[in-house]
Swiss-Prot record:
GO terms for cellular component: cytoplasm. One of its GO terms (biological process) is regulation of DNA repair. Pfam families: RecX_HTH1, RecX_HTH2, RecX_HTH3. The gene is recX. Modulates RecA activity. It is found in: Cytoplasm. Its main location: cytoplasm. The keyword rRNA processing does not apply. PANTHER family: REGULATORY PROTEIN RECX FAMILY PROTEIN. This is Regulatory protein RecX. Keywords: Cytoplasm. Belongs to the RecX family.
């Protein structure tokens, strides 16, 4: 059984407290945990108590890391989980951190997908958007639900704007309409647009019915 002889708030991180056992530095712990557990100088702690505190502290540190992960921009659950895994946190702490973020609506894959679709629709087709969301770990059902809300005319209009810009660039170095059409087709395909949209957009952009 050891006795807590000193509690010292860290100078560089006021959220962490250095704990001294029997006059010697032993470990640091979250100030939040000190408060919640009612830890005080002169308290006696055994190895089991120290193990419990270490586990709880690990959960708090993981939660704080999760919050920092989403501070600058939205993330999917998979993105947060992957980052926490890379930092070396255990699965139990990660799951609890994820649950915390969800509970306070800091993490919502459906909301993420909705915003992602609206943002990327300006410069990408539904195929590329679908692939990107899959890579980010969004479920297939959520992806398809959000993609089903896309107005095909709006998607086509965005593709046409991109095609016209690309066409202006291609015409500076190429005057063969057939070659331009093929390059334009490949360009739009790389942007994630489907064949039907590409066919119509290429026709409209260069006024050449190559795909009849």
């Amino acid at each position: 059984m050891a006795k807590i002889t000193k509690l010292e708030v860290q100078k560089r991180n006021k959220e962490r407290v250095n704990v001294f056992l029997d006059e010697d530095y032993a470990f640091s712990i979250s100030a939040e945990l000190i408060y919640k557990e009612g830890i005080k100088v002169k308290d006696s702690v055994n190895s089991e108590k120290l193990k419990v505190l270490a586990n709880k502290d690990a959960i708090i540190k993981c939660r704080e890391a999760a919050i920092k992960t989403i501070e600058r921009n939205l993330k999917t659950e998979k993105q947060v989980r992957d980052k926490l895994n890379l930092k070396g946190y255990d699965e139990d702490s990660i799951t609890k951190a994820i649950d915390f973020l969800k509970e306070y609506n800091f993490l919502d894959d459906k909301d993420y997908a909705n915003k992602f679709v609206k943002d990327k629709l300006k410069c990408q087709g539904s195929n590329k958007i679908r692939y990107s969301l899959m890579q980010k770990g969004v479920s297939k059902d959520v992806i398809e639900e959000e993609l089903s809300s896309i107005d095909k005319e709006n998607e086509k209009e965005s593709a046409l704007i991109l095609a016209q810009k690309k066409l202006n660039s291609l015409r500076k170095t190429e005057d063969d309409t057939y070659k331009i059409s093929n390059k334009l087709y490949r360009f739009l395909l790389s942007k994630g647009y489907g064949y039907d949209i590409i066919k119509d957009v290429v026709k409209e952009a260069i006024n050449f019915e190559l795909y009849d």
